[in-house]
């Protein structure tokens, strides 16, 4: 039995409200909140980046698992905002965690689904007998052009998952759906991404998320009724709710993992933070459907069954408790923290 042995999460404490961003740009905050379903977003501190977020989440996962870091045989960090263009984040994380030198490391990029790609690779390496434990992380300090619609939701945060045998949650099955879809992109040397506006919806997000979820269920014989929870990538709060309804899930299935309302879209950390929040309350034999999405475009779907081992697993502090620990900043401080003001 292979799956999630442990998990950890990290959410920066700083927040900025939609009203504050809208005030600066002279826009209607209520209309934006109604349209996105997002009320505020997380903001990284000046000394925080994807690497520090990854380290914090991974440290929690290792502490909870009670394992020796040197037992980890692979480290994968998925992100759109790696600190270096040339120099892996994964080696920074491995060094900070004390993994040693005898491990495989790689950075992954696939927009917002790079973290789940890491989970699939770790799962495969454990299953093949190559490693005892694999560490898959999704972490981002996502960028948005000032004044762009993305600015209201592009946030920071991440989650880490240790994959191995004797898990607290078994990965029963996984399935991916991929295409070449130019819905969101950023060229080299460009500081901010471009996007296709409404094109990011039906042809991109919904096509891939729905196809991956249906593909998983059809290939492995699952039905909606087999799942107690569902977690979808959260670019905003509207898309995952609509995707859930399209597949036949209710709000009860997705509400626990719908963290986007309170912290925005953490990109590579989005669906993984939702999964972590769901594992915080899940009981033995409950099943979770996880579906990520990455622009460009692709989705990874997982059927995850919680095991009896979860009962003795230390889940405090929980994701929602971390979300509630916050301090608000105004737009000027936000720009300073995001280093958008150049001296």
Swiss-Prot record:
A GO biological process held by the record: isopentenyl diphosphate biosynthetic process, mevalonate pathway
Q: Which residues bind CoA?
A: 198, 238
Its EC number(s): 2.3.3.10
Name the Gene Ontology molecular function terms of this record. acetyl-CoA C-acetyltransferase activity; hydroxymethylglutaryl-CoA synthase activity
Q: Which Pfam families match?
A: ACP_syn_III_C
Can you tell me which residues form the catalytic site? 80, 112, 233
Q: Which UniProt keywords apply?
A: Acyltransferase, Isoprene biosynthesis, Transferase
Q: Which Gene3D superfamilies match?
A: 3.40.47.10
Catalytic function, reaction form: acetoacetyl-CoA + acetyl-CoA + H2O = (3S)-3-hydroxy-3-methylglutaryl-CoA + CoA + H(+)
What is this protein's name?
A: Hydroxymethylglutaryl-CoA synthase
User: From which source organism is this entry?
Assistant: Archaeoglobus fulgidus (strain ATCC 49558 / DSM 4304 / JCM 9628 / NBRC 100126 / VC-16)
Lineage, opening ranks: Archaea, Methanobacteriati, Methanobacteriota, Archaeoglobi, Archaeoglobales
């Amino acid at each position: 039995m292979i799956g999630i042995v442990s998990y950890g999460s990290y959410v920066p404490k700083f927040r900025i409200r939609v009203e504050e961003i809208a005030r600066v740009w002279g826009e209607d905050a209520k209309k934006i909140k109604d349209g996105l379903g997002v009320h505020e977003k997380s903001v990284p501190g000046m000394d925080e980046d994807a690497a520090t977020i990854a380290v914090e989440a991974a440290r929690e996962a290792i502490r909870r698992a009670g394992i020796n870091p040197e037992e980890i045989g692979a480290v994968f960090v998925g992100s759109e905002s790696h600190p270096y263009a040339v120099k892996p984040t994964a080696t920074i994380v491995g060094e900070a965690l004390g993994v040693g030198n005898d491990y495989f490391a790689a950075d992954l990029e696939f927009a917002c689904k790079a973290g789940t790609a890491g989970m699939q690779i770790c799962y495969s390496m454990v299953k093949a007998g190559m490693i005892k434990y694999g560490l898959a992380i999704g972490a981002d300090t996502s960028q948005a052009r000032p004044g762009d619609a993305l600015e209201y939701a592009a946030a920071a945060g991440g989650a880490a998952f240790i994959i191995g045998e004797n898990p607290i949650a078994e990965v029963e099955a996984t399935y991916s759906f991929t295409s070449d879809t130019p819905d969101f992109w950023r060229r080299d040397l460009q500081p901010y991404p471009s996007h296709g506006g409404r094109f990011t919806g039906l042809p991109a997000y919904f096509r891939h998320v729905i196809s991956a979820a249906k593909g998983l269920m059809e290939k492995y014989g699952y039905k909606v009724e087999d799942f107690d929870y569902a977690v979808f990538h959260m670019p905003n709060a509207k898309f995952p709710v609509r995707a859930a309804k399209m597949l036949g899930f209710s709000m009860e299935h997705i509400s626990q993992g719908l963290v986007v309302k309170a912290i925005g879209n953490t990109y590579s950390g989005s669906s993984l933070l939702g999964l972590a929040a769901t594992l915080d309350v899940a009981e033995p034999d409950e099943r979770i459907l996880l579906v990520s999405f990455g622009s460009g475009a692709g989705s990874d779907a997982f059927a995850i069954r919680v095991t009896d081992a979860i009962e003795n697993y230390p889940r405090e502090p929980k994701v929602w408790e971390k979300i509630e620990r916050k301090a608000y900043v105004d737009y000027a401080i936000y720009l300073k923290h995001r280093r958008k003001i150049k001296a």
